[in-house]
Regions:
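Short phosphate-binding loop-to-helix
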Residues: 11-58, 67-74
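Hydrophobic helical membrane-anchoring modules
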Residues: 149-150, 155-177
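Short, small-residue-biased leader/transition segments that mark boundaries at the very start
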Residues: 1-2
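Short beta-strand scaffold positions
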Residues: 8-9, 129, 159
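Active-site acidic Asp-centered loop
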Residues: 60-62
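Residues in the short beta-alpha loop(s) of Rossmann-like NAD(P)-binding domains
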Residues: 9-12, 92
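Conserved core of the sugar-phosphate nucleotidyltransferase
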Residues: 38, 43-44, 64-155
Length: 177
């Protein structure tokens, strides 16, 4: 059985949850101190794991509004199967990357086609799925045997700034066509 809970300190979102209560969605109030800018994500997860008893946790971020439920369901199946201890969403980056003023993933004297570069996966905040023991034993949301679920650039849109919001509106308009 799944528990579907929105873990939030702001009770003004409750009216948005009411239409889904008949499908098992519940509001779970979290302490407002967890809203602070100095609070790290792992602190929020630690409190959530203490507040909600479950075998497997699925965390999503509202700042990634284009995440498909099918992506979450497919990644969850990998963890439920026992083949993986966790799963997370990622986009594949296969381009010329730099770090600390130097090429990171290619040799400037032997430039290969981008499609021949080794793919690099970038975590997104679309979702993290993990077994309780992963967090209890390792203190992290990704275990030692994670499944990397590749999402597309639309699902990967993350809204952190006003500019991101404007971009997301353009994506929403495009996807609505």
């Amino acid at each position: 059985m799944y528990k579907r809970q929105v873990y939030c300190s702001d009770e003004t979102i409750k009216p948005y949850i009411v239409p889904y209560e008949n499908k098992g969605l519940q509001f779970l109030k979290r302490d407002s101190y967890l809203d602070g800018f100095q609070v790290k994500g792992l602190e929020i997860i630690e409190r959530f794991v203490k507040d909600v008893d479950a075998d497997i946790y699925v965390l999503t971020h509202v700042t990634q509004p284009f995440t498909k439920s099918s992506s979450i369901e497919n990644a969850l199946k990998k963890v439920v199967s026992g083949e993986y201890d966790s799963a997370f969403s990622a986009v594949v980056l296969q381009d010329y990357m730099w770090m600390n003023g130097k090429p990171f993933n290619y040799d400037m004297k032997n430039i290969v086609r981008t499609q021949d570069l080794t793919p690099i996966y970038m975590e997104t905040g679309a979702f993290f799925i993990f077994r309780k023991e992963v967090f209890i034993e390792l203190g992290q949301r990704i275990g030692n045997k994670p499944y990397i679920y590749e999402i597309d650039q639309f699902e990967a849109v993350d809204i952190d700034t006003a500019e991101d919001f404007e971009f997301a509106k353009a994506v929403a308009t495009y996807l609505a066509k």
